[in-house]
Amino acid sequence: YVVCTIHPFDQSVILDAFGVDVDATYDQFSITYGEAIFNMSNALKMTMYGTASDGSVPPISDAELNLFLASLDCSGKRKELMRCALSLVGRVPYFWGGKSAPGWNSEWNTPKLVTSAGSSSTGTIRPYGLDCSGFTEWVYQTALGVTLYDGTWNQWDATHAITEEELLPGDLGFMAVPGTVPVNHVLLYAGEDAAGNKLWVHCASGIGVVLN
């Protein structure tokens, strides 16, 4: 037998033990060691748990997905769009400039360098995923083999305006008219909740694919 004394400790103990300066610049990238550790930690959480947000965006189970699809009053093609879109909730992070071919991408959630210009995340390492237009393009390609093209501006040009009353699951919604805001955002309409509130599934910056 041995007598043990256990003391709880936080990350600072490990950093001190290995002499890691969290404010030092991480080699080859314009981020600090602290930022690199945070990004890699998120990538690990996404791989292990399907979410980097400590459970705030849990994945949708197959049973929940089937119940949701059964509640929709729309065509089979639109339900397939929703099935594909909702299958990524809580499983794929937001990544500036992130695009993907149809189907599951094994590189999602792995640490990658953000190379697309125009974001505060450019030049940093983040868990690989999709951006907002990359998500809507992936959904349409995977579900129907239809391309919407890359970027919110191109997707706007590939669609036409409808009224709010005409909205059906799978329709696109835009934060603003292209050119009127520095950065736009595109979402997929997913119907209404029990209280009549409109639901949207989209790839949100800093979160990933979410239904709200």
Tell what function each PLM region has:
Residues Y1-L72:
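Membrane-proximal envelope biogenesis segments
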Residues Y1-V3, I14, A85, Y94, ...:
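Generic hydrophobic, helix-prone segments enriched in Leu/Val/Ile
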Residues Q11, C132, Q155-A158:
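Short linear motifs in intrinsically disordered/low-complexity regions
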Residues A17, T32, M48, S53, ...:
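Intrinsically disordered, low-complexity segments enriched in small/polar residues
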Residues D23, F38, D54, P59, ...:
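Intrinsically disordered, low-complexity, compositionally biased regions/tails
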Residues N42-S133, Q141-A143:
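N-terminal capping segments
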Residues E137, Q141-L211:
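...with weaker cross-activation on analogous glycine-rich loops/strands in unrelated enzymes
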